[in-house]
Structure formats: structure tokens, C-alpha cells
């Protein structure tokens, strides 16, 4: 993956919040065909993460935390400092990103953030079960949108890779609108994996879908991986 240049961001549009990218211990899954984020690891993540956490001001009362895997894979020292900072800055709402496999551990993990509203997002990427299998997401094909929504308030959708169709994208957006409080759309950029961009699909998305949804308050769209200020 490309070197990370920035790990802290202030997002002021649609969903105002502080947004941080921490280093985890490395995603346990590491099998999604299009992803190389799990390479964002080092021997002492706390050394990096402590500096990122010090930037938190509590300005919006909302903090969004992502890392090179799932929130449960943040090292204990970093997690303790994060909780301390959340309390110190009177942050009331925390968003965390986790893999589907951790769904039954969300309630217990939320208890670490006492008296806070903790909401979770997962990288479902698509609601087309066959496509999820091609992408090796590690989410069973019989998992329905309604079941995902039992655990998660938000999802990430991926647009613009091989084997994906225009109809897939339309369907995914409509399903996400129906079931989730908010969601993110990430336009795929080629990275160190063998997966290639579907440039025709990306162009159709930009010309035929993006103009109609870009101002929707439920939807954040990253046309580039650093559009939210981290990466």
C-alpha cells in the first residue's frame, strides 16, 4: 500500500466529526481481494497512534475511528489512551469500523466506552452475495441486509472493480438507503493487489449516479482514498 501521509482529519460537511486513522495489529482476515490496508502495521503502533490521538479536540462531540483492520485489533495501550481522550474531551458519540466476523462482540466492546453512544460500520462492499464471494469478503452469502442492519448503523460500499455491474451499484445504494443510518461509497483505486479498475463502470457512476446522490446527507462519497482527509 501507499505510505500514509495523514492520520487526523476534521470533517465539517454532512456528518461533522473528527476522523482518525490508527494503526492496528493487522487485520485478522487479510483476504479481501482488492485490499492492502492490512499492510499498515509496525512493531510499536502506540508510538504512532498516541500522536494521532493527541490531535483530538472534541470539537464536534463525535469521533470516527478506523484502523488497518477492526477496532478490536487496536492494541490495548492505544485503546486505553483513546478512551481516556474521549472522556477528557467529552465526546459523546464514537463510530468504529469492524469486520462482520466480530458482530457478536460489539456489545461487549462498546462497554469499554462507558456512557457513550458507540456505533459500528462494516465493509460489506456489496449486497450481491456472489460478488462478495468473488471479493473474498468472508461474509456468508445468506447474510441479508436486514441482518447486517441488526449490528451495524453504517456500511462501506465499493464501486469500480472487475466483475461488478452498473446494476449492482444501483441496487447496493438503494439497499443501503433503506437499511442504514448512513453509508460510505468508495470508488476503487488500483493498489498493490492484482485487482483492476472497471473504468467504464466508474465513468458511468460519475456521470449517471454521482450527480443525483452527491448531496444526500446519508451518503459520503470518496472519489479518491484521501477524500476524507486521512490516508
Where do the protein language model's features map onto the residues?
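Alpha-helix N-cap and loop-to-helix initiation/capping positions
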Residues: 43-47, 74, 135-140, 164-171, ...
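Core AdoMet radical
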Residues: 37-52, 59-76, 86-104, 117-142, ...
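Auxiliary Fe-S-binding modules of radical SAM enzymes
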Residues: 2-16, 59-60, 170-231
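Alpha-helix-loop-beta-strand connector modules within alpha/beta enzyme cores
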Residues: 79-89, 140-156, 201-223
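N-terminal pre-triad scaffold of radical SAM enzymes
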Residues: 2-41, 60-67
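Short, conserved loop/helix-junction motifs that constitute active-site signature segments
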Residues: 87-90, 111-115, 149-150, 177-179
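Conserved strand-turn element in the central/C-terminal portion of the radical SAM core barrel
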Residues: 127-129, 147-172, 186-195, 227
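Distinct, well-ordered alpha-helical segments
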Residues: 74-83, 103-113, 167-169
Amino acid at each position: 500500500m501507499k505510505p500514509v501521509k495523514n492520520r487526523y482529519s476534521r470533517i465539517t460537511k454532512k456528518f461533522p466529526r473528527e476522523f482518525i486513522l490508527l494503526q492496528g495489529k493487522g487485520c485478522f482476515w487479510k483476504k479481501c481481494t482488492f485490499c492492502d490496508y492490512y499492510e499498515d502495521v509496525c512493531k510499536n503502533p502506540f508510538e504512532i497512534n498516541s500522536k494521532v490521538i493527541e490531535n483530538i479536540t472534541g470539537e464536534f462531540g463525535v469521533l470516527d475511528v478506523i484502523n488497518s483492520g477492526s477496532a478490536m485489533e487496536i492494541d490495548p495501550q492505544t485503546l486505553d489512551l483513546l478512551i481516556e481522550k474521549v472522556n477528557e474531551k467529552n465526546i459523546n458519540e464514537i463510530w468504529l469500523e469492524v469486520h462482520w466476523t466480530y458482530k457478536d462482540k460489539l456489545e461487549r466492546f462498546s462497554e469499554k466506552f462507558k456512557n457513550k453512544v458507540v456505533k459500528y460500520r462494516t465493509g460489506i462492499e456489496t449486497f450481491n452475495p456472489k460478488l462478495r464471494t468473488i471479493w473474498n469478503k468472508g461474509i456468508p452469502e445468506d447474510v441479508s441486509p436486514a441482518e447486517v442492519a441488526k449490528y451495524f448503523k453504517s456500511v462501506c460500499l465499493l464501486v469500480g472493480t472487475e466483475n461488478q455491474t452498473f446494476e449492482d451499484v444501483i441496487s447496493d445504494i438503494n439497499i443501503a438507503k433503506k437499511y442504514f443510518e448512513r453509508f460510505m461509497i468508495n470508488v476503487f483505486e488500483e493498489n498493490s493487489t492484482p485487482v483492476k479498475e472497471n473504468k467504464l463502470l466508474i465513468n458511468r457512476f460519475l456521470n449517471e449516479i454521482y450527480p443525483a446522490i452527491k448531496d444526500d446527507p446519508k451518503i459520503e462519497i470518496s472519489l479518491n482514498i484521501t477524500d476524507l482527509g486521512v490516508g
